[in-house]
Amino acid sequence: MQLQKPLKIGLGMMGAGLFGIIFGWVLFPVILKSQLKKEMALSKKTDVRAMWEKIPFALDFKVYMFNYTNVEEIMKGAAPIVKEIGPFHFDEWKEKVDIEDHDEDDTITYKKRDYFYFRPDKSGPGLTGEEVVVMPHLLMLSMATIVNNDKPAMLNMLGKAFNGIFDEPKDIFMRVKVLDLLFRGIIINCARTEFAPKAVCTALKKEGATGMTFEPNNQFRFSLFGMRNGTIDPHVVTVRRGIKNVMDVGKVIAIDGKTEQDVWRDKCNEFEGTDGTVFPPFLTEKDNLESFSGDLCRSFKPWYQKKTSYRGIKTNRYVANIGDFANDPELQCYCDSPDKCPPKGLMDLMKCMKAPMYASLPHYLDSDPQLLKDVKGLSPDANEHGIEIDFEPISGTPMVAKQRVQFNIILLKADKMDLIKDLPGTMTPLFWIEEGLALNKTFVKMLKNQLFIPKRIVSVVKWLLAGVGFVGLVGSLVYQFKGKMINFALSPSSAPVTKVNPEINQQNQPKDISIIGESQNPPKVDM
């Protein structure tokens, strides 16, 4: 039996709807996931690999200095009063060099190189980098703290060395131009021939003090970031490429060939998470991210906070903090022992940086309240001082990131050195940095074209086809129903007939009464 044309159309529309449902809700997600697995892995000649090797735009590197306004009082034991100056804005360009792929275990090795360019136009109003700030002397306080911890009896001799190296300092503070401290370097005079200065300078050179370069005529140059600017980091990092398993993409598995650190205790020496420049796709709100920071020798585990959006793209915000080492069992292995952990919100960096520094969030956000009480002039704000990253969850792309950390030092109080015998002995801030990322319009458009536009097109098409199928189904049902009604109305069936047949009379003539339809004549009754 041949189908009528309207019914054929209806069935065709239902077929289109069924295809839309199967493709849009079943096949396309599988295809998209498969394609993303290929695109997000660190395969050669992919966009992700190219951006991973050399980020094609500058990151925002901002430095905020703390200027101390009551030095004389601090030297007598008073609480420090500080005033924040900044930001001093730098364009930071990142690249990876000496890259080698290892197909056998799906890994890749590389070294890092960063470039910094000062941007007065993006810095705080009127800041040129030539401003002189007053702050605790990093070298003198660091050396005094190390000697006090290891050989306190040597503090007196160290004081004599300071007199020679730093020209009879009157206090434990430095007056220095910001750019000199950050990058250009400050000169340390190690040309003195007296025993104490010479012994200290020899020890500095032998130990290879952090941030120190050595120049002719026994002149040392110290800066916070100068050695990083344009210099290849000597450490060789090994990460997973994610070709075999995209969920492992960027995961750090070794540094300098070692599969774990020898800095901390137990589990804290393990490399957990990615290198911080790439993350796995298909993130959900329940996923806790992990990234390893080589600068701080530890992993961070940001957690989901809330839904956000950036340039029209839906994102998930993740946040992190330094942690509470004393009360978090997972973090106690960063301490010499559980009873020797620093206060909440502080991390001791001595073993990592070989300097008696402490990391915290800026302005002691999420830290022990006593830290704020010991310093005047701080005002923590979660929006201004927290760590936050906004991810596009399907691709795992960081759209906006603000990584912030503050460096602190103890104003050491020790009787055996005149310069520090009356200091308050409390933790105090030095400076804090923000490393920021915000994808520009070009890369947001690229992400939309590669991911969201195809997804939206399929979304529209699948609903359109599903709608067409629904219309076809309804149309077919209506057509079938109407056809049956028409056939029923045109069928040759009679109206209902009622007959009454009484007994035959004596003349054998029938006596009946019949009603057929709507008769125009009255019924005839034969007696």
From Swiss-Prot:
InterPro entries: CD36_fam. Glycans are attached at N67, N229, N440. Principal component of the olfactory cilia membrane. Localizes to the antennal tissue with two to three fold higher expression in males compared to females. One of its GO terms (molecular function) is scavenger receptor activity. The keyword Manganese does not apply. One of its GO terms (biological process) is sensory perception of smell. It is found in: Cell membrane. Keywords: Cell membrane, Disulfide bond, Glycoprotein, Membrane, Olfaction, Receptor, Sensory transduction, Transmembrane, Transmembrane helix. Its main location: membrane. Residues 1-10, 478-527 are cytoplasmic. Belongs to the CD36 family. This is Sensory neuron membrane protein 1. The gene is SNMP1.
